[in-house]
């Protein structure tokens, strides 16, 4: 048995007969071994006696922050991980927290240095940027780490049952609670879950990643969550990267801890919106104020229609005015346009994508791809009749499935979407506040709303836009 700061740490489930291969022993065992070395060195570098009189109780209630009817999100500041290496080169904790504060109930900060390139110095940077509780996420084996975390303004800690035995857990949790800090208790299998229940954990994180071999299995949340008693807050951790996963797993969990899927995206704001709400587009924008309304409601994309027969047609000058309203990712909608016209428009407006709404074939798409800016995607709208059209075009990143040629306000038979792979599909046609919730459950990447959120063609209704996005967040 080892003693670290007076707390037993004999109970790591590593190197024991519970672990069935040398490889799986190694990952967690090595991390814990290195953490013991780190703790010993840090105690010499920054003794508790030097700062213990400056430690104050947390004023941000982690447990309360995770209560309520809505699904909650703990969003994570993570520079690197053992499975992926460096995830975010341009890692600025305060900047990241400045985005997260609009969406998160709590914010997690990786502080492990060796495996996650974290730092305790990140904690006060994040704490100063937000009002939410800040979770110190580390391999905690010693009371000293908890005291250090609180000194650096953490409001909660992670305790991993794969690392701690019951006695060590109880003592470490007591230290955290004595500082008014919350505890996220992590379990990754049925045995650890039963221990969490016995130990009276208030918030249980079900880790979908097996730390012994770093594999991901989202079924772990589906299988383990129903075993937890009423009153326990359930957080699903690891492997969550899509809105459809959030909607489906929200039946089992009260919330999600998400890090890698967000940290790997250059546009963090858009990345959070994709996971929390889907990749949604408000199309047919003609006014800057409507672009702003769409953005603040949670849209990722704004649609600009360059088809002159449309009542929502905009020219380049008008489009610039719309774009000035909000930093959406803008999609230009074209039908049977000259390739050079599409290219020029995409370049002049820095479009994120061009959406082809006519009978543009593979040859047209190939030629267009050659001349478009590399960061401008090609989307193709397809009309859905009695059967699902094929989606086999090369160089097409997204398909928009619509009724007819679009803009009709009519929906097609959504039952045709059953058993379809819809990761690269935006659903359009007749979408509004009354049916967007049902539409969101179909599993598409996002929704494309237009006439259903208007008071007149091209004039968006702020209340209807708000109602759509509020409905998308009810899960």
Swiss-Prot record:
Segments of this protein annotated with the region N-(5'-phosphoribosyl)anthranilate isomerase: 280-475
GO molecular function term, any single one: phosphoribosylanthranilate isomerase activity
Annotated spans, Indole-3-glycerol phosphate synthase: 1-279
One GO-annotated biological process of the protein: L-tryptophan biosynthetic process
Keyword Ribosomal protein: no
Pathway listed: Amino-acid biosynthesis; L-tryptophan biosynthesis; L-tryptophan from chorismate: step 3/5; Amino-acid biosynthesis; L-tryptophan biosynthesis; L-tryptophan from chorismate: step 4/5
Domain of life: Bacteria
Reactions catalysed according to its record: N-(5-phospho-beta-D-ribosyl)anthranilate = 1-(2-carboxyphenylamino)-1-deoxy-D-ribulose 5-phosphate; 1-(2-carboxyphenylamino)-1-deoxy-D-ribulose 5-phosphate + H(+) = (1S,2R)-1-C-(indol-3-yl)glycerol 3-phosphate + CO2 + H2O
Its EC number(s): 4.1.1.48, 5.3.1.24
Cross-referenced Pfam families: IGPS (PF00218), PRAI (PF00697)
Keywords: Amino-acid biosynthesis, Aromatic amino acid biosynthesis, Decarboxylase, Isomerase, Lyase, Multifunctional enzyme, Tryptophan biosynthesis
Function recorded in the entry: Bifunctional enzyme that catalyzes two sequential steps of tryptophan biosynthetic pathway. The first reaction is catalyzed by the isomerase, coded by the TrpF domain; the second reaction is catalyzed by the synthase, coded by the TrpC domain.
Entry's family note: In the N-terminal section; belongs to the TrpC family. In the C-terminal section; belongs to the TrpF family.
Subunit structure of this chain's protein: Monomer.
HAMAP family on file: IGPS_B, PRAI
NCBIfam families listed in its UniProt record: PRK00278.2-4 (NF001377), PRK09427.1 (NF006945)
Name of the protein in question: Tryptophan biosynthesis protein TrpCF
Species assigned in the record: Yersinia pestis
Lineage start: Bacteria, Pseudomonadati, Pseudomonadota, Gammaproteobacteria, Enterobacterales
Gene (UniProt): trpC
């Amino acid at each position: 048995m080892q003693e670290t700061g007076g707390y037993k740490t004999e109970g790591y489930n590593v190197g024991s007969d519970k672990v069935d291969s040398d490889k799986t022993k190694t990952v967690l065992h090595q991390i814990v071994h290195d953490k013991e070395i780190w703790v010993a060195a840090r105690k010499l570098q920054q003794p508790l006696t030097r700062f213990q009189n400056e430690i104050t109780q947390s004023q941000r209630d982690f447990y309360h922050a995770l209560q309520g009817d809505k699904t909650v999100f703990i969003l994570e500041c993570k520079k690197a991980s053992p499975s992926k290496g460096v995830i975010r080169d341009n890692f600025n904790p305060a900047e990241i927290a400045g985005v997260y504060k609009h969406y998160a109930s709590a914010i997690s900060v990786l502080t492990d240095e060796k495996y996650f390139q974290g730092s305790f110095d990140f904690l006060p940077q994040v704490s100063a940027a937000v009002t939410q509780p800040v979770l110190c996420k580390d391999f905690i084996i010693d009371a000293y780490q908890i005291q250090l975390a609180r000194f650096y303004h953490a409001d909660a800690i992670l305790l991993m049952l794969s690392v701690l035995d019951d006695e060590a857990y109880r003592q470490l949790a007591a230290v955290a609670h004595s500082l008014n800090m919350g505890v996220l208790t992590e379990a990754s299998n049925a045995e650890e879950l039963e221990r969490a229940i016995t130990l009276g954990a208030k918030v249980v994180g079900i880790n979908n990643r097996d730390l012994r071999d770093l594999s991901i299995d989202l079924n772990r949340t589906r299988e383990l969550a129903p075993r937890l008693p009423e009153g326990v807050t359930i957080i699903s951790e690891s492997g969550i990267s899509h809105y459809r996963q959030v909607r489906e797993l929200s039946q089992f969990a009260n919330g999600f801890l998400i890090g890698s899927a967000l940290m790997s995206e250059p546009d963090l704001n858009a990345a959070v919106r994709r996971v929390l709400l889907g990749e949604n587009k408000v199309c047919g924008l003609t006014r800057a104020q409507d672009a702003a309304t769409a953005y603040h409601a949670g849209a990722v994309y704004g649609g600009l229609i360059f088809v002159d027969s449309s009542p929502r047609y905009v020219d380049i000058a008008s489009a610039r005015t719309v774009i000035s309203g909000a930093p959406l990712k803008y999609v230009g909608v074209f039908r049977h346009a000259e390739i050079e016209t599409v290219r020029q428009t995409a370049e002049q407006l820095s479009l994120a994508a061009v959406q082809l709404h006519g009978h543009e074939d593979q040859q047209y798409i190939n030629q267009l791809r050659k001349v478009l800016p590399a960061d401008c995607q090609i989307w193709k709208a397809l009309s859905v009749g009695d059967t699902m059209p094929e989606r086999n075009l090369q160089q097409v990143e997204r398909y928009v499935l619509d009724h007819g040629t679009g803009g009709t306000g009519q929906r097609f038979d959504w039952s045709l979407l059953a058993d379809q792979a819809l990761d690269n599909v935006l659903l359009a046609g007749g979408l509004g506040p009354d049916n967007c919730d049902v539409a969101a459950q179909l599993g598409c990447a996002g929704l494309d709303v237009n006439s259903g959120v208007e008071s007149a063609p091209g004039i968006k209704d702020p209340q209807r836009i708000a109602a759509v996005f509020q409905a998308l967040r009810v899960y």
